Curated annotation (Swiss-Prot):
GO terms for molecular function: ATP binding; UDP-N-acetylmuramoylalanine-D-glutamate ligase activity. Its main location: cytoplasm. It catalyses: UDP-N-acetyl-alpha-D-muramoyl-L-alanine + D-glutamate + ATP = UDP-N-acetyl-alpha-D-muramoyl-L-alanyl-D-glutamate + ADP + phosphate + H(+). This is UDP-N-acetylmuramoylalanine--D-glutamate ligase.
Length: 496
């Protein structure tokens, strides 16, 4: 279809032919939103404070505006469509909210256009969220759907944006959504949705933990709600869900209406009386987290009728994504594992607990999260810690309180040298890579080389040197993938 219906369905209100829409953000998401709005006959204006981001839109003939000017003109717009990283606290969106102008995200726009039939018969959305495990679970779900012979597309916070896949001939969407995306998707009602777990994260974006949790809960408002029962916050969301069908999953033996583990096999007692799905040993993701991811994916797949055989085939052949518990090397009896995607304390804890003896490389940007409970839970697994990044002192303080006998090394980079370098840890030292930096090596690469070398000196045969940072990477790297690649490069250099 090339335009909005002349008689606009309620689901699209206030979006209609010629409707003036402010697109907040001119980057990749903004480009997709502006293109879709133009295609369907609305009148978008693109807002960004970077002239470089506005130039391509202006060259296409679209009006552009700065955020300060947009604030002054806000009542002239019927709708604002915001990029997912835009916090509700920024002046532009605060002004829109105060003026009563609706604010959608790109996911909300996609949901409404799909529900209105603008791309043909609406798809069934199977949505995954949670603090950790989203990407693995959604990828596993997509593999299950394909193995079951269903026409399914992987999208959202993984793969392609939802707006970019609605033209594809799919009946099902396997959608990973973040709390940012869900915050701006108030009308989303998926066929089935899963909350894997809830832990402190992104508190620099969400005003409170309650707001973060409420955003996650939006995936449980459709037909089938799925949540992890071993996580108290996720379980509470399931109890309060308005969904007609509520399904829990757990590591233990499942009750009726649940999926779980019995006799080392995954078992479905929610969509069948008692159906064995697959052996735990066939799950390629290490530790309890892999079992939980497989259970969540299986619950969503079973909710749309995927048979047990297809689920087992998909899991057995599944390959974990890069920088997610990825074994980089084994040398001298020591295993080196890249879990750079563990960007918050909850994920780091799950990663560490998958191994019996760990030299932990951690640190980065904690985003306002505390990690005392996590460090206490994994202290018995730690035989050493090497700390990097801006918030390394917070990690060191938690270690000093909950794992005081664990030796700790802090790696200091040039721009960090004015920061606190030591805390009261019994066996601690500081490595200043700025004093011995290799020519042409980036700060992040130098930090990681020093960190891996220090970890190697701590480790013994049978140990795992684990990069599970518990923080974001942007203080010293361009992203978690860059951090993971730096780790792999450093490992190869240290063990050769």
């Amino acid at each position: 279809m090339s335009g909005l219906p002349r008689s606009v369905p309620d689901v699209l209100d206030p979006l209609g032919p010629g409707a003036p829409v402010l697109v907040a953000g001119g980057r990749v998401t903004g480009q997709a939103v502006a293109a879709v709005l133009t295609r369907f006959g609305a009148t978008p204006t693109v807002c960004d404070d970077d002239p470089v981001m506005l130039r391509p839109h202006a060259e296409r003939g679209l009006p552009t505006v700065s955020s300060s000017d947009a604030v002054q003109q806000i009542t002239g717009y019927a709708l604002v469509v915001a990029s997912p990283g835009f916090s509700p606290a920024i002046p532009l969106l605060a002004a829109a909210a105060a003026a009563g102008v609706p604010i959608w995200g790109d996911v909300e726009l996609a949901w409404r256009l799909d529900a209105a039939g603008c791309y043909g018969p609406p798809r069934s959305w199977l949505v995954v969220t949670g603090t950790n495990g989203k990407t693995t679970t959604t990828s596993m779900l997509h593999a299950m759907l394909i193995a079951g012979g269903r026409r399914a597309v992987l999208c959202g916070n993984i793969g392609s944006a939802v707006l970019d896949v609605l033209d594809e001939p799919a009946e099902l969407l396997a959608v990973e959504l973040s709390s940012f995306q869900l915050h701006w998707a108030p009308s989303l009602r998926p066929e089935a949705g899963a909350v894997l777990n809830i832990a402190e994260d992104h508190l620099d974006w969400h005003a409170t933990m309650a707001e973060y949790t409420a955003a996650k809960a939006r995936v449980l408002t459709g037909g089938v709600a799925v949540a992890g029962l071993d996580d108290s916050r996720a379980a509470a969301l399931l109890d309060g869900s308005p969904a007609q069908v509520r399904v829990g999953f757990r590591l233990g033996e499942p009750a009726a209406g649940e999926l779980g583990v019995r006799d080392a096999h995954l078992v479905d007692r929610a969509f069948s009386d008692d159906l064995t799905l697959l052996p735990v040993a066939s799950i390629p993701v290490p530790g309890p987290v892999g079992v939980l991811d497989a259970l969540a994916a299986a619950a969503l797949a079973r909710s749309v009728g995927v048979p047990a055989g297809a689920i087992a085939d998909a899991v057995t052949s599944f390959r974990v994504g890069r920088h997610r518990a990825e074994v980089v090397a084994v040398a001298d009896g020591i295993t080196y594992v890249d879990d750079s995607k563990a960007t918050n304390p909850h994920a780091a804890r799950a990663s560490v607990l998958a191994y019996p003896r760990v030299v932990w490389i951690a640190g980065g940007l904690l985003k306002g999260a505390s990690l005392h409970a996590e460090v206490a839970a994994m202290a018995s697994r730690l035989v050493g810690a090497v700390l990097i990044g801006r918030d390394r002192a917070a990690v060191a303080e938690a270690l000093s309180r909950h794992a005081p006998d664990v030796p700790v090394v802090q790696v200091v980079a040039g721009e960090d040298t004015g920061m606190p370098a030591t805390v009261e840890v019994p066996v601690a030292c500081v490595l200043d890579v700025a004093k011995d930096d290799k020519a042409g090596e980036t700060v992040g690469a130098a930090v990681m080389t020093a960190a891996v070398a220090a970890a190697r000196r701590m480790a013994q045969p049978g140990d795992t040197v684990l990069l599970a940072p518990a923080g974001a990477s942007f203080d010293q790297f361009t992203g978690y993938a860059d951090r993971g690649e730096a780790f792999a490069t450093a490992v190869r250099a240290v063990i050769r």
